[in-house]
Design a protein with these regions (language model features):
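N-terminal signal peptide c-region/cleavage motif recognized by signal peptidases
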Residues: 16-18
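Transmembrane beta-barrel strands of outer-membrane/channel proteins
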Residues: 52-58, 90-94, 124-126, 176-180, ...
Length: 357
């Protein structure tokens, strides 16, 4: 923990330096503009967004008749720009009930550097294995695991690799990804391949992928995943189908997930989410499911934002039933605190105080 506070001190000092550097750059841009340089562009934002993210609450298991207060993790995130085209992103679990240490990469969910222009994005580092599912695509800290599929609860998604995304137009994105296989377990020469399409139209959003996850030399688990989101003003729903098999002839019959997840945004300060799914889990040693055979999972969640126009503080109440055959209730709070904004506010107050002396 001592090393963490040293690291956090370095981060805060870096933010302070970046704030000052940004001010100098902005002043230089204004001076150039005042000298009549019509070609001067706006100053780029190079101050990193550094934040901490956490969730805690009370959870009750009705099958076991046990309940307790607990936290779902404390995360540190850093995002920023190196240049107009290069950016970086970092998200690390500082502490959780199953943390294995502070500085090991096992607790780093993602650590990436990206190059992006109008038609291309190249990303390298540790990132999520691309899978066509909105349930899977969301932040862990925003998910209610007892409402989710066994696939979500079993898949080792954070892997080192690289991806290339192409933008044929404003509404479509095509992605190719190569990374370590989620079934490699640290062994070399086992890789995963993904081909994905994300579309964002006026009332429809898609996230489709075709995947191959290597588990032995020349042997792959194949997967097809189709996530579809339909938006109608304050109401939306996701319709998803995912299927997996080591033998291509079993692709649509042995191991699959089918789910529908509606969301109703009843006001600016709250929404209601639901989920109902049917999953068939084959007897497969690769996935280590918590349950074999067919079963249904479902749940409801209500989310509230007590501060107007501020979604970084969220209250929730959720109930779900999944592969553990229990009914679980969770009531809690999720919060995100921007260290960068705090430093900016401190610098601004100090500057104003000095100006008034």
């Amino acid at each position: 923990m001592k090393r963490f506070f040293v690291f956090l001190g370095v981060v805060l000092a870096t933010i302070g330096s970046a704030v000052r550097a940004q001010e100098v750059d902005s002043i230089a841009q204004l001076q150039k503009a005042s000298w009549g340089d019509a070609k001067t562009e706006e100053a780029a934002e190079y101050i990193p967004d550094v934040y901490v993210h956490s969730r805690m609450g009370y959870e009750h298991d009705f099958l076991e008749q046990v309940g307790r207060f607990d936290g779902n993790g404390l995360y540190l995130g850093i995002e920023g720009n190196i240049s107009p085209n290069f950016s970086y992103s970092f998200y690390h679990c500082i502490a959780s009930s199953d943390s294995q240490g502070l500085f090991g990469f096992d607790n780093t969910q993602w650590l990436t550097v990206s190059y992006e222009n109008d038609w291309l994005n190249l990303t390298a580092g540790k990132n999520a294995v691309m899978v066509g599912s909105f349930e899977y695509d969301g932040y862990d800290i925003d998910s209610y695991y007892f409402m989710n599929s066994s696939f979500w609860n079993s898949f080792d998604c954070w892997q080192w690799g690289a991806s290339a995304s192409f933008y044929p137009d404003d509404d479509h994105e095509l992605t190719i990804q190569v990374c370590n296989s989620p079934f490699s377990f640290g062994e070399p020469n086992l890789f995963a391949y993904a081909l994905g399409w994300r579309g964002e139209m006026e009332w429809f959003e898609s996230l489709w992928t075709a995947n191959m996850w290597q588990y032995d030399k020349g042997s792959y688990m194949k997967s097809m995943n189709f996530a579809n989101r339909f938006d109608f003003d304050d109401f939306s729903f996701d319709l998803e189908y995912m299927t997996r098999a080591t033998d291509i002839k079993d692709l649509f019959t042995r191991d699959f997930t089918l789910m529908i997840a509606p969301t109703y945004q009843f006001s600016d300060w709250g929404c209601i989410k639901g989920k109902f799914g049917w999953e068939k889990c084959g007897e497969d040693e690769l996935m280590e499911y918590g349950y074999d055979g067919s079963y249904m999972f479902y749940g409801l969640a209500a989310e509230f934002f007590p501060i107007k126009d501020y979604e970084d503080l969220r209250l929730h109440a959720s109930w779900g039933h999944g592969c553990n055959r229990s009914h679980i209730l969770n009531i809690g709070v999720t919060w995100k605190f921007s260290l960068t904004q705090a430093v900016k506010d401190i610098v601004s107050k100090c500057r104003n105080k000095s100006a008034n002396l």
